[in-house]
């Protein structure tokens, strides 16, 4: 009787695990599905031809915006700069 109870519990645990879709890989917070829901966007592909569906609203909350600062480099005019000129070949000449 106890063996039957253990088997039933294990059966329901195994079924509950398979009901949830698999998570996406490579640190993407989403699920692998055949079709994404209306509020989801597909970030990248999953295995077996499925899409990695990410909730767009949740993704915006957790995404941190970083400001990219470009440093302006003043070029020294005393330095010599090299240029390489590549030869070109004209196949057709179009006259208008």
Curated annotation (Swiss-Prot):
InterPro entries: Beta-defensin (IPR050544), Beta_defensin_dom (IPR025933). Its main location: secreted. Residues 1-21 form the signal peptide. GO terms for cellular component: extracellular region. Disulfide bonds join 24-52, 32-46, 36-53. It comes from the Eukaryota. Keywords: Antibiotic, Antimicrobial, Defensin, Disulfide bond, Secreted, Signal. GO terms for biological process: defense response to bacterium; innate immune response. It holds the Pfam family Defensin_beta_2. It is found in: Secreted. PANTHER family: BETA-DEFENSIN 123 (PTHR15001:SF3), BETA-DEFENSIN 123-RELATED (PTHR15001). Has antibacterial activity. Belongs to the beta-defensin family. This is Beta-defensin 20. It comes from Mus musculus.
